[in-house]
Amino acid sequence: MDLSALRVEEVQNVINAMQKILECPICLELIKEPVSTKCDHIFCKFCMLKLLNQKKGPSQCPLCKNDITKRSLQESTRFSQLVEELLKIICAFQLDTGLEYANSYNFAKKENNSPEHLKDEVSIIQSTGYRSRAKRLLQSEPENPSLQETGLSVQVSNLGTVRTLRTKQRIQPQKKSVYIELGSDSSEDTVNKATYCSVGDQELLQITPQGTRDEISLDSAKKAACEFSETDVTNTEHHQPSNNDLNTTEKRATERHPEKYQGSSVSNLHVEPCGTNTHASSLQHENSSLLLTKDRMNVEKAEFCNKNKQPGLARSQHNRWAGSKETCNDRRTPSTEKKVDLNADPLCERNEWNKQKLPCSENPRDTEDVPWITLNSSIQKVNEWFSRSDELLGSDDSHDGGSESNAKVADVLDVLNEVDEYSGSSEKIDLLASDPHEALICKSERVHSKSVESNIEDKIFGKTYRRKASLPSLSHVTENLIIGAFVTEPQIIQERPLTNKLKRKRRATSGLHPEDFIKKADLAVQKTPEMINQGTNQMEQNGQVMNITNSGHENKTKGDSIQNEKNPNPIESLEKESAFKTKAEPISSCISNMELELNIHNSKAPKKNRLRRKSSTRHIHALELVVSRNLSPPNCTELQIDSCSSSEEIKKKKYNQMPVRHSRNLQLMEDKEPATGAKKSNKPNEQTSKRHDSDTFPELKLTNAPGSFTNCSNTSELKEFVNPSLPREEKEEKLETVKVSNNAEDPKDLMLSGERVLQTERSVESSSISLVPGTDYGTQESISLLEVSTLGKAKTEPHKCVSQCAAFENPKGLIHGCSKDTRNDTEGFKYPLGHEVNHSRETSIEMEESELDAQYLQNTFKVSKRQSFALFSNPGNPEEECATFSAHSRSLKKQSPKVTFECEQKEENQGKNESNIKPVQTVNITAGFPVVCQKDKPVDYAKCSIKGGSRFCLSSQFRGNETGLITPNKHGLLQNPYHIPPLFPIKSFVKTKCKKNLLEENFEEHSMSPEREMGNENIPSTVSTISRNNIRENVFKEASSSNINEVGSSTNEVGSSINEVGSSDENIQAELGRNRGPKLNAMLRLGVLQPEVYKQSLPGSNCKHPEIKKQEYEEVVQTVNTDFSPCLISDNLEQPMGSSHASQVCSETPDDLLDDGEIKEDTSFAKNDIKESSAVFSKNVQRGELSRSPSPFTHTHLAQGYRRGAKKLESSEENLSSEDEELPCFQHLLFGKVSNIPSQSTRHSTVATECLSKNTEENLLSLKNSLNDCSNQVILAKTSQEHHLSEETKCSASLFSSQCSELEDLTANTNTQDPFLIGSSKQMRHQSESQGVGLSDKELVSDDEERGTGLEENNQEEQSMDSNLGEAASGCESETSVSEDCSGLSSQSDILTTQQRDTMQDNLIKLQQEMAELEAVLEQHGSQPSNSYPSIISDSSALEDLRNPEQSTSEKAVLTSQKSSEYPISQNPEGLSADKFEVSADSSTSKNKEPGVERSSPSKCPSLDDRWYMHSCSGSLQNRNYPSQEELIKVVDVEEQQLEESGPHDLTETSYLPRQDLEGTPYLESGISLFSDDPESDPSEDRAPESAHVGNIPSSTSALKVPQLKVAESAQSPAAAHTTNTAGYHAMEESVSREKPELTASTERVNKRMSMVVSGLTPEEFMLVYKFARKHHITLTNLITEETTHVVMKTDAEFVCERTLKYFLGIAGGKWVVSYFWVTQSIKEGKMLNEHDFEVRGDVVNGRNHQGPKRARESQDRKIFRGLDICCYGPFTNMPTDQLEWMVQLCGASVVKELSSFTLGTGVHPIVVVQPDAWTEDNGFHAIGQMCEAPVVTREWVLDSVALYQCQELDTYLIPQIPHSHY
């Protein structure tokens, strides 16, 4: 290198310091678009917008906590110049040093440059060259397969030419040269160019003179390249002489040369393996050489890329090559030496190599010794530099150690010493064991570069480059090599027979089996070096990296080894290794597959050398393909094999990249990391068994190649593979991990996951964090998974499963951080189980714990830093947060909201930007991971993980692909539609796989298994259900994906997939559990999956809860079969959404992150919660005649979902700000992930519904239909409340934020009393007690209704709970109403079956009885507000229903139908998760023909709102604790009034007032102000009031519920129900008008066709509004028009808003300018509330209570600008002039277009309005007065006058006019 290592280090340190200064404190990335705040802090514009979007109103500066607003942000051009200069410096540094500055920031840039060029050239070249080569390969003989593998179907000379050309191409693109080198046959010139560039013309010339033959004629570089290829000996020798500068060129040239030479040699000596290997090596060298030569930086980058491509390939090739040439005596050493040989003594030794391939290989090794040492030292320095710069140090040490561990490290070092100066050597070393981390670095950098390139290439060529081991046409050449090895081999591997010739050839060539690999490792000859390398590499990361390419085993080993190697520098290594593995790994996997088969075929010892060489070459090619392709997107490879799925995945990947602003590289890395993880996973599998490995690899291969398809087949394969036995299940898990990784394009992630697991073993927290830095996007999600994994680590096996699950779940980016940790844990623990203990441990041992710890601590600090500001750009934050959470569960909880919010926002942004594109993918990763992890953690980690993981894999992969489209799932609900079709197949596949997984899981989790199985079967059996499930899943995916894309989107999506796949309540439960986290997961899982454990865990709940659990399972299964499938589907959808929502929070939250003890605590809490929930549900179930089992299960589910919510609440409680952050998450869930949040609650409700639905089917079906909304909602609310309660209890014993102390009581009571034992009345009592209001009344009501009022009691419970949840459960209550609405009796009734109708009739009869009882109770307790509150609510509702059963029913039906419509509407808009969720709800409703389904649907809606609110409100409600009680009292009073006055209105009003109080209070209590731009806080506020409403609403809600029952009754036939619903809308309107005199306005409006616009709302909130509008048939427009009747503003609790154009126009037009709370409260109450109570009172500028909107609305006959002629002159910012003119026109003014148009006359008052700050000419507006005799005022005069709706005096706003002479 030009600079000494020390010098380079110093420079890099300086650059690093500069970079740190110039990085955004929020996202920790180089600030791309710097904006400065008032406090002079610089942030990314993206981060700040994300932060500001989180909270409406002033947000706080993350650094100084000063208030910041969007207006206060100013672009900092100077800072951006600094960043640009820094990037230039880094670029120059890279060019000067030939080293890639390992940095995510630079990666992106370099990737953009080099990858694009490479993509272009490589694409073209590769496509042509590879294809032709592929054809040639196909034509060529088995010996050619090696050539084929290299993509050198060309003759030996052809190989040389190709190499040269490739090198040339590499040089030409230089940064892109990596791709190009494999690009075309005619890349000799390029190769030569590449060689000359960095290496230097002199040395090249030297090389060329010595080695020049024909190619010397080419320019030095070309000559060198040609020499490399043609003049093998000469070139090699020349290269050796010029080791320092030519090192890169030399090495590359050497590599090329050996390849070429060997190619010639092969043709000459006919040693195809050698030739092939040489060629592969050449390609690698070529790549390295070209890249390095190109410019050290570029070359190194390319080299990194090459290493990424080649490390596995090159190493494997080198290993095999070395093994083949060296006779495999020191296979390990030979491979490293071989490369080194080529590098150090390329000419002589290569000649020897070529001629004396075996003999010379040893010679080279000896020769290599010194150079290797030198090279190692230099590489070490470089690595240290990289480590300091990014994360290479640990890797370097590991690699060095590994190399040394490998036989000939010393020799290699010697050889490398000669070549060490140049990066190419380094790369070789990297390829060898010596410089693994540099290889990793190179790879990671290349991954970054190639990721971008690949993205572009993928876009252009459909992921062709992904497997660009040799050529861009990975599908072609890779098909020859990779398709031959990848496709053919996957087939063979899948089949396990040596079906393909190529495979056979490879196997024969490779002679490497997973077993052979181990055996060969024992062998001392040719096999030994490579085999040992593989074995040792598995043990020693260095060898493993190289060996991965050698065989499938090696691949796995490589993954492990890489992980280990990387582990020393956990983040750097992992990141780079991820990148490296991503590129190399998919190919590696392909190659591994190939090699596995080759190994199998390679049983022949004689041919082993040649075969290995061939295999090595092929492997190298495959790796290279992967490097270039995987580098881009692992999905590219997948695309090639499975272009459709791949396409989706590519999209997914691209989207992942796109959504994450700075995360493209990281995401790519993440995507690739899963592949790495997969490899690692494969490796354990491999070790476990060849067959397993094969299966794993085929899956991986298929995953990589076919993507989605691969997933499917692989999944089936996995299913089969897993089904056979638990070990297989584990294997399947691994396979799935591989599959998910590859499919999800997470080879790296998986690999990283594995590696990180090692790190995690060292430092769970650290490793979690470690991943975070590496993963920018997926990391966020990864973190939670990681954290979970970390926690799981404590639970070795569960963690193991979790890790794999994490890998699956976070196939995108989560796995990067999480999976790695998990994976290593998994490997450490699971592998021990999976026979990979040695490797895992070895890896762990290999990695220096101190290094890992240090790295992880650093990462942790980084994570902490990021965690402080969880923004969209914090892709790694979730991971980091997770890491932190791992250490601090509370912290996690707190941050998890952030992460969730981040994810949500990310998702939101992504959804917005690529709502139909990619958010889901990341979401998939994130969501899937947390879900799986958590799900797996408690009970069947391995199995759950595997199952969940498998499902997640498929789900996330298919979904990933689908979510690639659905990626915006949260936002891009639309994508689900795209993906729904894929989802169906995916679902089917996932279902199948999940089913098998579930079956296996069932073995362990008996009850769970049946349910899951049932769910799976149910889904398959019910196509419509499946489609619904798919839709729902899609919706859920969208929602959950929106949820977790923001954090748990992936999880949810995966969870959704799993749920859908499992299509079982248990699945949902598991998902919920997973999402929720270990606590709930353990709880639910133990309870549900393992009733015994659950029983044990649940002391109080032991008897019933386990029983319930089992029963639940059975019943759930039954429900799933009978009523559950649709319901479950909807539940799944809902649940995943909710789960996602909660999962994000909880998953990140301590649930999974909690230690086992913590988990146990959580579990106990969860159990209590479940107990509580079960009790509630049991009560409901008992009353509703739902079996307790289903209800407990439902409750458990609900508890899980809500529990997760509670956890969030917990974190909220613990950290109000965190809660706010979480709240935004929920809000995002609500809007971007609206569906998700409600989905969770809905899910729970759906689960409850499912359980209920079963019982209901028996007897409660009708009641369920009517009660489904009510009772289910009640249960939901109750359960959610209970869940919240238990979670809250867990968190802070204030599940119902409105009753913290009561919550404790409730929890205590619930805990003390078995939920089932408690019975409804007891539960009701508890709830009442919790509420503290109407406890006795509720008990009375419960007792009275207990038998007959299942629904009523449910309502009461719900109300009670809602009132208890009070504000906290307001969401639930609202949910109840929403549920009713959502249940959309119309759709519900529509779907009602005859059985349901009968059941409904029975239920209606019971309801009537209950109503009578209620009336009696109400009469008795009418004067007892506190006691009769719940009763009153229920009673009033019942009474109301009794009084106006039709009306109430109609209303409820209307609400339901509206809600349903709204949901579907949301669904249609889809941009929001809520919409999708709504779709799900709707589909759920429509498709849920059974009450459960209906219930699910209603649940869903409420969940959407309620859950959102529940979570928001949880903390809020806790804060609202007191308001809640007050509200309860108020509500009681109101209810009494209601009873007197038809309560709904009063309730609404009263409840609204308390709500306002609550809103204010909760927010204040929460420390969140709606205005603080915290969507969550808003929802909290909203929910707080809604909680109060819930308390109040109960009467109306009950009424709604009862009417709904009646509606169901009246609509006992689906048609009738539908009619009722459809008619119900009008009826509801009427009933609203009747019941709510004050609601008359809105009712009238409803009758009159309302039209509304929204302003200042987040996407989640907008989705909620959209649903609301849809439900109430309100037109929702983007722009305010004359027809607009309502302007919905985002306000704080005091109804103070920001001034927006719509705000002004709404006031000027006399519209209803109402708070967003109006929508949320109306949704909660299930009816349109009176706008009066929600009218905006003021704004932040003109005063908080100026009543301008009211004044304007009531003074439309008195226009404030009447008689004025106003000319809006000049430019205006933030609003078009025509809008300003319209505004003044609406206020009565006459608009004058030109100053000259003013008419002078009496009674006319001309005014000129200008905006001085919009004028570019400083004094232009000062001379306006010269043109007309009119006063000139600022625009503020208009705005202030309009806002206050009072014409302001002009004096304050006059602009002094300068005389014309002065102008």
Swiss-Prot record:
The modification Phosphoserine is found at residues 114, 395, 398, 423, 434, 551, 694, 708, 725, 753, 840, 988, 1009, 1143, 1189, 1191, 1211, 1217-1218, 1280, 1328, 1336, 1342, 1387, 1423, 1457, 1524, 1542. Keywords: Acetylation, Activator, Cell cycle, Chromosome, Cytoplasm, DNA damage, DNA recombination, DNA repair, DNA-binding, Fatty acid biosynthesis, Fatty acid metabolism, Isopeptide bond, Lipid biosynthesis, Lipid metabolism, Metal-binding, Nucleus, Phosphoprotein, Repeat, Transcription, Transcription regulation, Transferase, Tumor suppressor, Ubl conjugation, Ubl conjugation pathway, Zinc, Zinc-finger. SMART domains: BRCT, RING. Its EC number is 2.3.2.27. The keyword Mitochondrion does not apply. Pathway: Protein modification; protein ubiquitination. GO terms for biological process: chordate embryonic development; double-strand break repair via homologous recombination; fatty acid biosynthetic process; mitotic G2 DNA damage checkpoint signaling; negative regulation of fatty acid biosynthetic process; positive regulation of DNA-templated transcription; positive regulation of transcription by RNA polymerase II; protein autoubiquitination. Residues 230-267, 311-338, 650-739, 1181-1216, 1322-1395, 1440-1505, 1565-1598 are annotated as: Disordered. The modification Phosphothreonine is found at T1394. It is found in: Nucleus; Chromosome; Cytoplasm. A zinc finger (RING-type) spans 24-65. It catalyses: S-ubiquitinyl-[E2 ubiquitin-conjugating enzyme]-L-cysteine + [acceptor protein]-L-lysine = [E2 ubiquitin-conjugating enzyme]-L-cysteine + N(6)-ubiquitinyl-[acceptor protein]-L-lysine. The modification N-acetylmethionine is found at M1. Residues 1642-1736, 1756-1855 form the BRCT domain. GO terms for molecular function: DNA binding; RNA polymerase binding; transcription coactivator activity; ubiquitin-protein transferase activity; zinc ion binding. Residues 705-716, 1373-1395, 1445-1470 have a biased composition (Polar residues). GO terms for cellular component: BRCA1-A complex; BRCA1-BARD1 complex; chromosome; cytoplasm; nucleus. Phosphorylated in response to IR, UV, and various stimuli that cause checkpoint activation, probably by ATM or ATR. Phosphorylation at Ser-988 by CHEK2 regulates mitotic spindle assembly. Phosphorylation by AURKA regulates centrosomal microtubule nucleation. Residues 248-260, 327-338, 727-737 have a biased composition (Basic and acidic residues). Residues 1397-1424 are annotated as: Interaction with PALB2. E3 ubiquitin-protein ligase that specifically mediates the formation of 'Lys-6'-linked polyubiquitin chains and plays a central role in DNA repair by facilitating cellular responses to DNA damage. It is unclear whether it also mediates the formation of other types of polyubiquitin chains. The BRCA1-BARD1 heterodimer coordinates a diverse range of cellular pathways such as DNA damage repair, ubiquitination and transcriptional regulation to maintain genomic stability. Regulates centrosomal microtubule nucleation. The RING-type zinc finger domain interacts with BAP1. The BRCT domains recognize and bind phosphorylated pSXXF motif on proteins. The interaction with the phosphorylated pSXXF motif of ABRAXAS1, recruits BRCA1 at DNA damage sites. Heterodimer with BARD1. Part of the BRCA1-associated genome surveillance complex (BASC), which contains BRCA1, MSH2, MSH6, MLH1, ATM, BLM, PMS2 and the MRE11-RAD50-NBN protein (MRN) complex. This association could be a dynamic process changing throughout the cell cycle and within subnuclear domains. Component of the BRCA1-A complex, at least composed of BRCA1, BARD1, UIMC1/RAP80, ABRAXAS1, BRCC3/BRCC36, BABAM2 and BABAM1/NBA1. Interacts (via the BRCT domains) with ABRAXAS1 (phosphorylated form); this is important for recruitment to sites of DNA damage. This is Breast cancer type 1 susceptibility protein homolog. It comes from Gorilla gorilla gorilla (Western lowland gorilla).
